[in-house]
């Protein structure tokens, strides 16, 4: 319905990714404004491009961030850039629902500090904003960099709420923490049962992402797994009731042929 939503956007190994990749892509697609830009957490590989976008004057109406996002230098810088750009910041916690036309974001994580973490301080990965996305019958989950403990916490909450009925047999799943073996647990994936799993990682990452264990869990859950390191930009659509994923590099190869 004319809304443009963006989740994260950064790189730890590509300089000026916002200026030379994200912004040109948005302009090429004719996107004149981002209505809501979601920030899962403040690692450079998730926000470096956003920082450049906000500094460029490109309009972003809302930033959606976790209410429990740690107050570090990156958060303070984002808040300052958003204020200078006239971008409104919305703080989300578990159970919050945000509507954009037919699309809705439901926050699955984090919850309140006392309930979620026993009042203890935690790192920014554990406090990543996790969202369930739904538009008509098209559904997906964005996970940030949460670990297996947070996945279990989300499942426990879903089992106690009506929201849980909709967060299963989803169309796409953005693999947690780039396919880390400390995330993407069997129980979490089997409960979500995603048709397609998307793994964002580079060939040269020093962490060995994605792990064989995580990919195995995705495949065991019945997911088709796609990787940005192999396919470049990934596009998921639903056609005739089935989710389909195409990669930019595959499309480019077919075009040349």
Task: Give the positions of each predicted feature.
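Non-globular, low-confidence helical/coil segments that flank catalytic cores
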Residues: 1-257
């Amino acid at each position: 319905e004319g809304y443009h939503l963006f989740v994260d956007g950064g790189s730890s190994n590509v300089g000026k990714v916002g200026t030379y990749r994200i912004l040109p892509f948005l302009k090429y697609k004719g996107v004149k404004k981002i209505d809501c830009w979601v920030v899962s957490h403040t690692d450079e590989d998730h926000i470096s491009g956003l920082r450049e976008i906000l500094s460029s004057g490109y309009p972003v109406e809302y930033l959606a961030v976790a209410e429990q996002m740690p107050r570090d230098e990156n958060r303070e810088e984002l808040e300052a850039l958003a204020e200078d750009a006239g971008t409104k910041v919305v703080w989300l916690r578990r159970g919050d629902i945000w509507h954009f036309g037919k699309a809705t974001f439901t926050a699955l994580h984090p919850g309140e500090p006392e309930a979620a973490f026993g009042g203890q301080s935690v790192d920014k990965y554990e406090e990543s904003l996790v969202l369930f996305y739904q538009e008509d019958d098209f559904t997906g989950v964005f996970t940030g960099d949460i670990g297996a403990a947070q996945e279990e916490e989300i499942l426990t909450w879903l089992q106690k709420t009506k929201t849980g009925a909709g967060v299963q047999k989803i169309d796409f799943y953005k693999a947690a923490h780039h396919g880390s073996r400390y995330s993407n647990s069997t129980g979490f994936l089997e409960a979500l049962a995603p048709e397609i799993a998307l793994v964002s990682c580079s060939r040269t990452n020093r962490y060995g992402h994605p792990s064989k264990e995580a990919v195995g869990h995705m495949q065991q859950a019945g997911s088709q797994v796609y990787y940005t390191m192999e396919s470049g930009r990934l596009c998921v659509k639903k056609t005739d009731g089935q989710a389909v994923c195409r990669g930019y590099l595959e499309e480019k190869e077919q075009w040349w042929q």
